[in-house]
Every structure is written in structure tokens, then in C-alpha cells.
Regions:
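Positively charged, amphipathic and often flexible ligand-engagement surfaces
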Residues: 1-307
């Protein structure tokens, strides 16, 4: 019930406007968001790199309502890719299509993301653009664009997708992405979806996560296993060892500010780790979804917000 409430709040525009303007809201966000500026995000990336972990930078925002907002967001990502190369960071970027104007003009969104992929592909060394997955109304269009971009000359290995294990269609989508040689980030999913589209029971979501993890690890393609769930991590490690899959052939991924102890423990044990670092002023929907994924985070925030 609490999870459903938090997801509902993540979509509430008046609550979002109030929270993003409040000092208390901003303080709450700092646990999971690196800051509001590019420089703050890059500083966080450098700090994480020093701990032996890679980074994926996300300029927070979604469902922009005009072309100018979409172009401004793309400019931020262009700058990020430039700064990553200049500062020699172990970092890539994660992009939402609705932040690139998918709701406004699909052609524009395609053009802007294509420009980011081209920038990443021309880097020295080449970089990588992860196209984030959003709610189910966007699933097919998102995957179609990833496939389209991946097929373009020079883009192989530069653009990747995200699969959510709570989606019933997940296995079918994984099979198609693997057949095309596309890199995948596997997560559980954090949007409210109806039963005909998504598994509702945690046990079903977890079982599908393990099943899809095994498919990814056996593929020979470099993927990201994104989870903070110790049982999912243990299942991935056990399968990798059973199949003699080397640690450098995939990476675990976790969110900024969550289970830092576990992140560092896995690195010490020889596993690769990438931390997803969000930043920007539009942090409210992201924060609410993180709290919905793990309501215990809400208690943590309330205990620490006034310290």
C-alpha cells in the first residue's frame, strides 16, 4: 500500500512543484541525488571513480512539454560526454526519451539521441549511451529506437537498453536485444503497471530477474546487473562461478546513495561496479520512485533529515 502511495505521489504535479521548491525537500533529495549542477555531478563521479567504481550520469527530467526543453537537456548531455572525455572519467550517460522530447515530437527525440550516440561513438575512448526505460506506454517505442540506433554504422556497442524484470514481456525483449548484440541493464522496475502488463508479486518479479540474469550472463555480451537485493546478487555470482563466467565480463550496478557498503564490498571481492548518479533540479519523481522501491529508505530519510 505504501509503495502504491509513493508511486502515486511521484506522478502528482502539485506535490512535485511544492517539494522541488522547498528546502526540506532539497535536503531529502541529497541522499540519492548528487546535486543540481553538472559540476556537482562530475565531482561525485570523480569521487566514485576513486573508489574503483564506474559511473552512469543521469540529468534528471522526463515528459518535457516543448522542443526547447528537449534541446536544452540534450545540450547538457553533450557537455557531460565532453567533460567525461576531458577529465578521463570512467563514466557513461543514461537518457530518458521523454526528456529528449518523445511526447512532443518523436522525430526530434530520435535526432537528439542520435546526436548523443554519435558524440559518444566519436570519443577517445568511445563512450556509451544507455537509453533508460520508462513506463509501459513507452516500452515499444524505446526499444524500437535502441534497435534502430544500434543498426546504424559505427553505433554497435555505443547504445544500450534497459529491461525491467516485472514486465511480462521482458524475456521476449531480452531475446531480441541479445540477438542484435545490444547491451542491457537489467532492473526490477519502479512504475505502477496493471497485472496484465507486469507481475504484481515480488516472488514473480524476483524469479524473472534471476531467469533474465542467467540469459544475460550466458550471452557473452557485456551487461549490467542492476540491483541492491543481496539474493539477486548472490544468484548472479553463483551462476557466474558455476558457468566460469569471468568477473570482467559483466558489471553490477547500484544507485547513488544506496548500499554504499555493499558496493565497496563487491569491488573488494573483484566484481565490477557502476554507480548510477542522478543530478538536476527535477529530482522529485526520481526520489519518490526510489522510496517506493524500498520504503525503508523513507524511514532513513526521516531520521536523518533534521540532523
Amino acid at each position: 500500500m505504501l509503495r502504491a502511495l509513493l508511486i502515486h505521489l511521484s506522478e502528482n504535479r502539485p506535490m512535485r512543484a511544492m517539494a522541488e521548491r522547498s528546502i526540506v525537500g532539497l535536503r531529502m533529495s541529497r541522499r540519492f541525488v548528487a546535486g543540481t549542477t553538472v559540476e556537482e555531478a562530475l565531482a561525485a563521479a570523480q569521487a566514485v571513480n576513486r573508489l574503483g567504481m564506474g559511473v552512469s550520469l543521469d540529468n534528471l527530467g522526463e515528459n518535457v512539454t516543448n522542443a526547447e526543453e528537449a534541446r536544452q537537456s540534450a545540450q547538457v548531455y553533450q557537455r557531460l560526454l565532453h567533460e567525461i572525455e576531458e577529465r578521463k572519467l570512467q563514466a557513461n550517460v543514461s537518457v530518458k526519451l521523454t526528456h529528449m522530447g518523445l511526447d512532443v515530437d518523436e522525430k526530434l527525440a530520435r535526432e537528439l539521441v542520435s546526436g548523443l550516440v554519435a558524440k559518444a561513438g566519436n570519443g577517445h575512448p568511445r563512450n556509451f549511451v544507455r537509453v533508460d526505460m520508462e513506463g509501459s506506454p513507452y516500452t515499444q517505442r524505446t526499444l524500437d529506437l535502441v534497435h534502430e540506433l544500434h543498426r546504424q554504422p559505427g553505433n554497435a556497442g555505443v547504445v544500450g537498453a534497459v529491461i525491467q524484470s516485472y514486465m511480462r514481456r521482458g524475456e521476449q525483449d531480452v531475446e531480441k536485444l541479445l540477438a542484435a548484440g545490444i547491451r542491457i541493464r537489467l532492473c526490477k522496475g519502479a512504475y505502477k503497471e496493471p497485472p496484465e502488463i507486469a507481475y504484481q508479486k515480488k516472488s514473480e518479479v524476483d524469479a524473472n530477474y534471476v531467469k533474465l540474469t542467467k540469459m544475460l550472463l550466458k550471452s557473452g555480451i557485456y551487461h549490467g546487473i542492476a540491483t541492491h537485493d543481496p539474493r539477486m546478487i548472490e544468484a548472479a555470482i553463483a551462476f557466474a562461478r558455476q558457468e566460469r563466467i569471468p568477473p570482467q565480463s559483466f558489471e553490477f550496478q547500484m544507485l547513488y546513495g544506496i548500499r554504499r557498503d555493499l558496493q565497496q564490498k563487491l569491488v573488494r571481492e573483484g566484481w565490477r561496479m557502476r554507480v548510477y548518479i542522478p543530478f538536476g533540479t527535477e529530482w522529485y519523481p526520481y526520489l519518490m520512485r526510489r522510496l517506493a522501491e524500498r520504503p525503508a529508505n523513507l524511514l532513513f530519510l526521516m531520521k536523518n533529515i533534521f540532523r
